[in-house]
From Swiss-Prot:
One Pfam short name: YidC_periplas
Region named Disordered: 43-69
Compositionally skewed regions (Polar residues) per UniProt: 53-68
Protein name as catalogued: Membrane protein insertase YidC
Taxonomic lineage: Bacteria, Pseudomonadati, Campylobacterota, Epsilonproteobacteria, Campylobacterales
Family the entry assigns: Belongs to the OXA1/ALB3/YidC family. Type 1 subfamily.
Cited InterPro entries: Membr_insert_YidC, Membr_insert_YidC_N, YidC/ALB3/OXA1/COX18, YidC/Oxa/ALB_C, YidC_ALB_C, YidC_periplasmic_sf
Keywords tagged on the record: Cell inner membrane, Cell membrane, Chaperone, Membrane, Protein transport, Transmembrane, Transmembrane helix, Transport
Function: Required for the insertion and/or proper folding and/or complex formation of integral membrane proteins into the membrane. Involved in integration of membrane proteins that insert both dependently and independently of the Sec translocase complex, as well as at least some lipoproteins. Aids folding of multispanning membrane proteins.
Signal peptide coordinates: none
Length: 536
């Protein structure tokens, strides 16, 4: 069996490796993804007060030890002291001066005609939660309620301000919030009457769209532009960052974050909780001014709030390539007005860019097909002498101008493009609720009738029959024939937008193959019709 596998050409090995990679990737992501944060058990009011602890930090960045911080367990549904109403969102603030819940009101976010709640249940770290470095002050802060200057804030076309105040022993804590129509806000926190070091959190990540295939955790942009990520279940140590541009808790589609536009940035502490999930805090003494946002990771919206926030949309190691692809997709959407057709146009652009390489690869494959019988003869003749086999094979390639590597380059180039497009389409909130045609009414979810995956598999099968092959043993041919079935199985649960890309890519490849086959056939006929004695 090993001898047979050694005979596989390089293109075949790449195809098999791709299939095996997908076969490994999906089960691994499902069964071995980091365990998501679980709610802690209900505790008494006294226990909760004693558990609240501020991160303990040193003065040097990234070298301080940060203690594990117990999460607040006060129910966000109780003691709501203020409600903020916007055309796109509704926000509730509890008696501890925290954002208890955020509901998205746009049609594509509604679930069973109900507003979509973003934040985790009662045990999670809440946005705007304040903790103090002094344990006594911290305990008091979680026992005393804030009061608000307004019960209801309605935002229409202009910003609205809300002030929250907490009276503590020897000083007063004030939070002044200015809310904007898109869900972003400005925040000023101040302690008056005594100098106090405090820690303010943007909150734990939203839980509206937790997904094992997507990044869930904390994203931070350092002063130099470096993006730092800590995934849920993977917080190995407590860290401190000086001069951060933003810190965001994110799930697949949503985020709660803090940011500043000033060059000095933020001093951010990322603490590790008992489940090894990251918990972000901004550290300050007496006074802190920053801005925040809670809502969807919509690229255009984030860009309009502050361009640097587009880096909150995280594509992993392939971000450098995926982000330009999304910008191209977004431009195509502006051109055609439909995300499905934008994906079709993106696929066409990719196929056109790759066409010169594809053409060379297909010509090379055709040449290899033409000399396949001679290749088999040489393999049979020199099967006991690998050195002579290699020498004679190279002579055969050289004589006929064939390149065994020629058919592999287009495939190799397509794989990073595919994985980049996979990340783009999988993480794009813009595709949520976006329809295409007929039965495809949401490009962010799987095809409910499996029509697109079946069409994709059928197109791959047809493409196989049109593509020249150089099989020299039966095992190679059998593996190749099963690839459409394997890929169809993989793509059944993939978002419709991603399956649409692969299907349309196959259709364009078939059209290219038919064109190239026709061109090569015409050249063969012309060469055959040329008188043998005629010279140029």
């Amino acid at each position: 069996m090993l001898d047979n596998f050694d005979k596989l050409n390089l293109q075949m090995r790449i195809l098999i490796a791709t299939a095996i990679s997908l076969l490994f990737f999906i089960p691994y992501s499902y069964f071995f993804a980091p365990v998501k944060e679980a709610p802690l058990k209900e505790s008494t009011s006294m226990e909760r007060a004693e558990q609240q602890a501020a991160p303990q930090t040193s003065s040097s960045p990234k070298e301080g030890q940060v203690s594990s911080v117990a999460m607040a367990e006060t129910s966000p549904s109780k003691d709501i002291i203020a409600t903020v109403q916007g055309s796109h969102f509704r926000l509730e603030i509890d008696s501890l001066g925290r954002i208890a819940q955020v509901y998205l009101k746009d049609a594509k976010f509604l679930k069973e005609q109900k507003e979509l709640p973003l934040l985790a249940p009662l045990s999670s770290l809440r946005p705007l939660e304040v903790r103090f470095s002094d344990a006594t002050t911290n305990k008091e802060a979680f026992a005393k309620s804030y009061y608000s200057d307004r019960d209801l804030v309605e935002i229409r076309n202009t910003p609205e301000t809300l002030t929250l105040t907490q009276e503590l022993e020897g000083f007063k804590l004030t939070k002044k919030l200015t809310f904007y129509p898109d869900g972003n806000y400005d925040l000023e926190v101040e302690t008056s009457g005594s100098q106090k070091r405090f820690f303010l959190s943007p909150g734990a990540r939203p839980i509206a769209e937790s997904d094992k295939f997507a990044f869930n955790g904390v994203v931070l942009k350092e002063s130099g532009g470096t993006i730092h990520t800590t995934e849920d279940g993977d917080a190995k140590k407590d860290e401190i960052f000086e001069g951060a541009r933003f810190v965001a808790s994110v799930d697949r589609y949503y985020t709660t974050l803090f940011f500043v536009k000033e060059p000095q940035g933020l001093r951010v502490v990322i603490s590790k909780n008992a489940e090894k999930n990251p918990e972000p805090f901004v550290e300050a003494l007496d006074h802190l001014k920053l801005s925040g946002y809670i809502g969807a990771k919509d690229f255009r919206l984030l860009e309009s709030i502050y361009p640097s926030l587009t880096d909150v949309v995280e594509y992993g190691f392939i971000t450098f390539f995926a982000k330009p692809l999304f910008l191209l997709l977004d431009w195509l959407y502006k051109f055609c007005g439909n995300w499905g057709w934008a994906i079709v146009l993106l696929t066409l652009v990719v196929r056109i860019i790759l066409f010169p390489l594809t053409y060379k690869g297909m010509v090379s494959m055709q040449k290899l097909k033409d000399i396949a019988p001679k290749m088999k003869e040489i393999q049979e003749k020199y099967k006991g002498d690998p050195q002579k086999l290699q020498v004679h094979m190279m002579e055969l390639y050289k004589k006929h101008g064939a390149n065994p590597m020629g058919g592999c380059l287009p495939l190799l180039l397509q794989m990073p493009i595919f994985f980049a497009i996979y990340r783009v389409l999988y993480n794009a909130i813009e595709l949520k609720g976006a329809d295409w045609i007929l039965w495809i009414n949401d490009l962010s979810v799987m095809d409910p009738y499996f029509i697109l995956p079946i069409l994709m598999g059928a197109s791959m099968f047809l493409q196989q029959h049109l593509t020249p092959t150089t099989f020299t043993d039966p095992m190679q041919e059998k593996v190749f024939k099963f690839l459409p079935l394997i890929f169809t199985f993989f793509f059944v649960t993939f978002p419709s937008g991603l399956v649409l890309y692969w299907f349309v890519s196959n259709v364009f490849s078939i059209a290219q193959q038919l064109f190239i086959n026709k061109t090569l056939e015409a050249k063969k006929r012309a060469a055959a019709a040329k008188p043998s004695g005629l010279s140029d």
